[in-house]
Amino acid sequence: MTRNWSFRVIFVSAMWCALLKFATLEAPKDDFEYDGGCPFVVLDNGTHVKPAGCSHLCNGAPETLDNIECYNVTEEVAKRMTPGIPYACWLGWCSKGECKRDNRTEVCYRGSEEE
């Protein structure tokens, strides 16, 4: 009988603790402004997108990317590409805001503005 009583006390205590924990949790506050900032221009290769270059100005301040694959194309050139037309783009790797070109190319596309 004592064993059954001990189990009930432990079970009720555990349930009470769980109830208190979940009853006091608040939803996290999301203070991030998703409409701010300046997104990088990206080009598509049919399965993935990569940034065109690794740096740009955002509200007068430089923004850079690091340690990510990129296309060795300036944002200005990428913006002038005709959407949906295949281009041969040099691949590179972002290092301190510069897209360091390697010896590979792949087909890339500029997406439409609606995407």
From Swiss-Prot:
Output the Gene Ontology terms for molecular function. C-C chemokine binding
Instruction: Alphabetically list the UniProt keywords.
Output: Disulfide bond, Glycoprotein, Secreted, Signal
The question of whether Glycoprotein is a record keyword is answered with yes
Record InterPro entries: EVA_Class_A
Q: Which GO terms describe its cellular component?
A: extracellular region
Indicate the transmembrane segments per the record: none
Keyword presence, Plastid: no
Glycosylated residue positions: N45, N72, N103
- Which positions carry the signal peptide feature in this UniProt record? 1-25
UniProt cross-references to Gene3D superfamilies, sorted A to Z? 2.30.130.100
Pfam families referenced in this protein's UniProt entry, alphabetically: EVA_Class_A
**Cystine residue pairs:** C38-C58, C54-C94, C70-C99, C89-C108
Q: What protein am I looking at?
A: Evasin P1183
Taxonomic source organism: Amblyomma triste
